Amino acid sequence: MVLPGTDGAELVEALKPSRSIRLQPDVLLQGKAQRIGDDEVILYKPRWGAFYGTPLEALLRERGIDALVFCGCNFPNCPRASIYEASERDFQIAVAADAVSGIYPQGIRELERIGVTVQETAEIVSWLTSIPHQ
């Protein structure tokens, strides 16, 4: 538990594009996005899945993003919920298996059955760097 507006609720400095950025709990707790850079936003995630009760899908769609790569902490909870939510919304999905803690063989098989590509980070990075960018 953290108290909004306190140092304990802040992002780690190394993750911020600028040291002067502070979280805006009044914005985030209303379910809105806080923009902290040209391509960076912060969202408050009220449940396990990243799409539930957040503007994530709208933010991705307005940028023309239709494919997502997932990594994360504790696969059985937040990553899995977010992956299934993304699948329900027809995003193309890849999971970096070596960058997800708690992932297990049956979970990988279940993801593959719903069309998720499961690869190692190096394979995903290699593929992404081979795509011509607009």
Question: What is each PLM-predicted segment?
Answer:
Residues A67-P76, Q92-P105:
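A short glycine-rich beta-strand->turn/loop micro-motif centered on a GG-aromatic cluster
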Residues M1-R63:
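Active-site alpha/beta core segments
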